[in-house]
Amino acid sequence: MSCSCNTAALRIFVRNVANIQVPSSQQVTPRALSGIYRPRTTTHLPLHTRSLHTTRAARTDSTDAVSEEANQSEPPTATEKPETPKLLFRKTRSPPNPEWKAKNLPQRPNYHPRDYKKKPGLDVDDTPKEELKKKIRWRGLPEEERRELYAKAGKEMPDEAERQARKQERQAQKLKQSLEGAGGRGGEGGEPFKKYNPSNPKREDWQHQKNALKEKFPEGWKPLKKLSPDALEGIRALHKQFPDEYTTEVLADKFQVSPEAIRRILRSKWRPDPEEEIERQERWFKRGTQIWQRYAELGVKPPKKWREQGIKPNKYWKEEDKEKTFKDRHIANVRLHRSLL
């Protein structure tokens, strides 16, 4: 009887070299089955003791190989199900079917966006585009050729007056529909909007006042006299303190202006800012110097305030004044007043 370790080693060598499945006569023992699941551990035994266990290890290896061959050679029975290999990765989904979209989507009818008619109410003339092009082409032709074309089409050529009447009718119908569409939406509270009438538009308050002033002063507001800021404040103060005594007519007579000017002064609520007040005083000071400079040239003695500013009367005027008559002096004063206005 040969040693099992020698035969097992020879059988493994021949099988690996020739790649031939050699059946084994040995049966699988429970001990061999337990060796399949036995964990392999590294031995820390000395060298002289390791030789004692070589035969047992070779025997277990041979039994393991024989059990694998037996499992591979035996066909699966009807009751036993073949083992499915375990998947190392997740199952991949099947590739999408490109035909499912075509199957599920409903078939849309073939149409063209230009084939749709315009919305009702937007355009009165619903004639097709080809007929419109044909009409435009026919308009450039001579009258005889147009009559022949209309006769071939079985229609009568419209006259120029009839064409203009149709055009005006279409424009009026368009305007009417647009007004009805604007008034049908309705405003707040469900009330329809009022139609816009261009002949009678809504006017603001200042427009009414402007028209009233135009009727009252056709040539515009031209005051004969300008009052200083101090005079304006004095008019307001007098009328506020003594309204019964200093009425509009009395103030107009006192300051030699029209009653309308007094009414405007009392009605106005505008007050200048500090910067505007400074500019206003400077402007009136320059105006006063210019006026009294003219008076001084005519021989009128200016007040002390303006004499301190360097305005002195003309000395030659007095010498010439002796020779002039009263009438000449009166004419000179009238001319002076007219130039100052």
Curated annotation (Swiss-Prot):
InterPro entries: NGRN/Rrg9. Residues 37-129, 149-217 are annotated as: Disordered. Residues 181-190 have a biased composition (Gly residues). It is found in: Mitochondrion. Residues 112-129, 149-172, 201-217 have a biased composition (Basic and acidic residues). PANTHER family: NEUGRIN (PTHR13475:SF3). Belongs to the RRG9 family. This is Required for respiratory growth protein 9, mitochondrial. It comes from Sordaria macrospora (strain ATCC MYA-333 / DSM 997 / K(L3346) / K-hell).
